[in-house]
Regions:
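N-terminal flexible/basic segments that precede or flank functional cores
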Residues: 1, 42, 52-54
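Recognition helix of helix-turn-helix/homeodomain-like DNA-binding domains
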Residues: 29-45
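Structured, helix-rich domain cores that form ligand/interaction pockets
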Residues: 3-4, 12, 16, 58-332, ...
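Short coil turns linking two alpha-helices in DNA-binding domains
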Residues: 20, 31-34, 330
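DNA major-groove recognition helix of helix-turn-helix/homeodomain DNA-binding modules
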Residues: 46-62
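Conserved hydrophobic/aromatic packing and binding residues within compact polymer-binding modules
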Residues: 10, 24-25, 35-38, 334
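Short basic helix-loop element that most often maps to the first helix and adjoining turn
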Residues: 8-27, 52, 327
């Protein structure tokens, strides 16, 4: 983009966001007169100042450049009655769950609804385990929305049912690219980070990580040990989506992500804080501020007194609007199966079709007619034919009346 196009787009954004020249100039560390000359095309732009202006204008975006999600939720219930948990806590109809005679973490079986997993065991010390990973959280939000429940309500239901927290991930998503992951890595390596964490790992987008670490996430920084009960992870979400789904990097809504990953007791205390204050920003950033602070070097002072880096200060709350716990409901669809079909199977199907035409055979037709649907395929068809509302169990147990 040349300077003329950039300046015109900048002017339009500034007016759309309701930002005065003076306010933007102050944020960029220049005078209003200097900025005015830039916007009129009378002052040439160098790459460094252009980058500063691009970053600062997005901080005024009224569409909230940062938002916070629950991205992993795992809780164990002290009961062997999985169906009761499905009906009373998830408030879903078991008829829409797929039963599978295998599970994870030592559980013998599980009930599945899309990416919502309920692990089952007849051993009382294992009980029933609800696991919601990223997609599972988004799908659960569809049901919570239809039930007119919030995450806070759902967590309270889990705790009321005797739930024991096993894992909770809070994800702060950066839509404007303000959280510069490569820069954070450089500052950490340069010793410009005040932290209680003893361990740190960083990966470039081409490195293969261990089994406990996600792959293909662009530049990645881990703060704390991944085997501990609390650690943090910052990575380039747009690169991850490009590798996983082929989404163009510039078209990805979320540019960067900062995650707080908590297990067991740490997860429990985070949930208690969320339920006490119902303020996800307070919970998330009190944890972040306790454990880590990125600073700018001041060699004439002790490290603990170094000034907080401007970008980091904005990220943790200085001079920005508060962020709330939001939801991004995404119903389960056949898209994953269709994507696999398109990439892995469609070329072979097309080849067999051509072979049938050439030889006047019906190989493909015969194969489809002879194929038998497995339970998981029937389950997918059941989900496609039903609505979110139809899967909800509206009969709230009598003992829960009045809680909400």
């Amino acid at each position: 983009m040349n300077d003329k196009n950039f300046i015109e787009e900048l002017r339009q954004k500034r007016e759309e966001y309701g930002v005065t020249q003076t306010r933007l100039a102050v944020a960029c560390g220049i005078s209003r007169e200097y900025y005015n000359r830039i916007e009129k095309g009378k002052q040439p732009l160098n790459d460094e100042l252009r980058e500063v202006i691009e970053k600062q204008i997005e901080r005024f975006n009224p569409q909230e450049p940062l938002f916070l999600l629950i991205d992993y939720f795992r809780v164990r219930f002290p009961t062997t009655d999985a169906l009761a948990i499905i009906r009373d806590v998830l408030q879903l109809k078991p008829d829409y769950m797929l039963y599978e005679d295998y599970g994870k973490y030592g559980y013998e079986s599980k009930y599945v609804l899309g990416d919502i997993n309920i692990m089952c065991s007849m051993q009382e010390h294992l009980g029933v385990l609800l696991e919601l990973k990223g997609k599972g959280c988004r799908q659960m939000e569809c049901y919570l929305l239809a039930q007119e429940r919030s995450w806070y309500d759902f967590m309270l239901d889990c705790m009321t049912a005797g739930g024991v927290m096993k894992r909770l991930d809070l994800a702060i998503n950066d839509k404007a690219g303000i959280l510069d992951i490569p820069k954070l890595k450089e500052k950490y390596k340069a010793g410009e980070c005040v932290s209680y964490f003893r361990m740190q790992k960083d990966y470039s987008g081409t490195e293969k990580c261990g089994s406990d670490l996600p792959k293909n996430t662009g530049e990645t920084l881990y703060l704390g040990s991944t085997s501990s009960e609390l650690y943090m992870c910052a990575y380039q979400k747009n690169y991850e989506q490009y590798v996983k789904n082929g989404t163009e990097i510039e078209d990805t809504e979320i540019k960067n992500r900062f995650e707080i990953r908590m297990k067991n007791e740490r997860a429990y205390y985070a949930v208690v804080d969320l339920l006490t204050y119902r303020d996800a920003e307070r919970t998330a950033f009190s944890i972040i501020n306790h454990y880590v602070r990125f600073v700018d070097r001041e060699d004439d002072k002790p490290k603990s007194q170094w000034i907080t880096n401007d970008d980091w200060a904005w990220f943790v709350g200085e001079n920005r609007e508060p962020i709330r716990l939001t939801t991004k409901p995404e119903p389960y669809t056949l898209q994953k199966a269709l994507h696999w079909l398109q990439r892995q199977v469609a070329p072979t199907i097309k080849m067999v079709q051509a072979l049938d035409r050439e030889n006047r055979t019906t190989i493909l037709k015969d194969m489809i007619e002879q194929a038998e649907l497995k339970d998981k395929h029937k389950h997918l068809l059941q989900l496609e034919k039903s609505t979110i509302e139809e899967r909800i169990d509206t009969a709230v147990p009598q003992e829960n009346d009045g809680i909400f």
